[in-house]
């Protein structure tokens, strides 16, 4: 039977998005590039097969799943494996199959702790186990429009209005400047250069989208922590005061702009 893991808190043991993908790819010999690709459920099914041979029917897993109903079928296989091995964790299938970063990142953080608690180090050939199949890339969803908060952080009737200072770095969608040697005009030369630049732009856009999702994910957690601190601000708890100090700390020389002040000259894009 499996060793259950109930801790879901953020600790120093949690892996970053990049480290998590590296662990998955190395363990299962895959080439995942985004956390969102875990929404198919096939990765978890194979990890269960690695941890507890025979706990899941691996031939029922659709490693090339591209549609939501196929993802759901994979998670049903995973749920059956959890039940067989006595795993108490409830799988939020309806959220995971939507392919959103935050839901999938939270679940894989828990699963990594579960894996570490149960892995005995035995040899496992992941490619042979899945008969050479590779996980299909998840269709790229349109990037959501980031809604600006209607009220600044710290607004409320129970506590003074304060904001968590967030230093933002302007992200340019321009590709990095590269020295392009001038060549004599030849047939197709311009098309090749244009295609290469377009590819670079697309890669940068995907990187920006990933960074924005990750930023919003951790920003939401900081916001929740701030609300809890504000609700208990009247208490003389040294730990609470220390948390508040960390939340509102700024880098040396950083100044929070006054509301209503004319904006400074900004870089034009």
UniProtKB/Swiss-Prot annotation:
Pfam family, one: EB1
UniProt GO cellular component terms: centrosome; cortical microtubule cytoskeleton; Golgi apparatus; microtubule; mitotic spindle pole
EB1 C-terminal domain: residues covered: 186-256
Protein's UniProt keywords contain Iron-sulfur: no
UniProt GO BP: attachment of mitotic spindle microtubules to kinetochore; cell division; establishment of mitotic spindle orientation; negative regulation of microtubule polymerization; protein localization to astral microtubule; protein localization to microtubule
Entry keywords, A to Z: Cell cycle, Cell division, Cytoplasm, Cytoskeleton, Golgi apparatus, Microtubule, Mitosis
GO MF annotations, alphabetized: microtubule plus-end binding
Domain Calponin-homology (CH) intervals: 14-116
Subcellular compartments: Cytoplasm, Cytoskeleton; Cytoplasm, Cytoskeleton, Microtubule organizing center, Centrosome; Golgi apparatus; Cytoplasm, Cytoskeleton, Spindle
UniProt-annotated stretches for the region Disordered: 168-190
Described function: Plus-end tracking protein (+TIP) that binds to the plus-end of microtubules and regulates the dynamics of the microtubule cytoskeleton. Promotes cytoplasmic microtubule nucleation and elongation. Involved in mitotic spindle positioning by stabilizing microtubules and promoting dynamic connection between astral microtubules and the cortex during mitotic chromosome segregation.
Entry's family note: Belongs to the MAPRE family.
Name of protein: Microtubule-associated protein RP/EB family member 1
Organism per entry: Xenopus tropicalis (Western clawed frog)
């Amino acid at each position: 039977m499996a060793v259950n893991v109930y801790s879901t808190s953020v600790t120093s043991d949690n892996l970053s998005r990049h480290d998590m993908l590296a662990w998955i790819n190395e363990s299962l010999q895959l080439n995942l590039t985004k956390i969102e690709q875990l929404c198919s459920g096939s990765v978890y099914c194979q990890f269960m097969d690695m941890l507890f041979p025979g706990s899941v029917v691996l031939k029922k897993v659709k490693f090339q799943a591209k549609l939501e109903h196929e993802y759901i079928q994979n998670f049903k296989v995973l749920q059956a494996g959890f039940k067989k091995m006595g795993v108490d964790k409830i799988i939020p299938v309806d959220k995971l199959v939507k392919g959103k970063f935050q839901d999938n990142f939270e679940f894989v953080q828990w699963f990594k702790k579960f894996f570490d608690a149960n892995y005995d180090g035995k040899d496992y050939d992941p490619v042979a186990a899945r008969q050479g199949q590779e996980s299909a890339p998840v269709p790229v969803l349109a990037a959501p429009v980031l809604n600006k908060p209607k009220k600044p952080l710290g607004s409320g009737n129970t506590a003074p209005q304060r904001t968590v200072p967030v230093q933002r770095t302007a992200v340019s969608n321009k590709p990095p400047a590269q020295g392009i040697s001038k060549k004599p005009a030849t047939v197709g030369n311009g098309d090749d250069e244009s295609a290469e630049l377009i590819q670079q732009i697309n890669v940068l856009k995907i990187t920006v989208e990933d960074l924005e999702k990750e930023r919003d994910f951790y920003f939401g957690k900081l916001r929740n922590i701030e609300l809890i601190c504000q609700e208990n601000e009247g208490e003389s708890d040294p730990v609470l005061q220390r948390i508040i100090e960390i939340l509102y700390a700024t880098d040396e020389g950083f100044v929070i702009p006054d509301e209503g002040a004319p904006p400074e000259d900004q870089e034009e894009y």
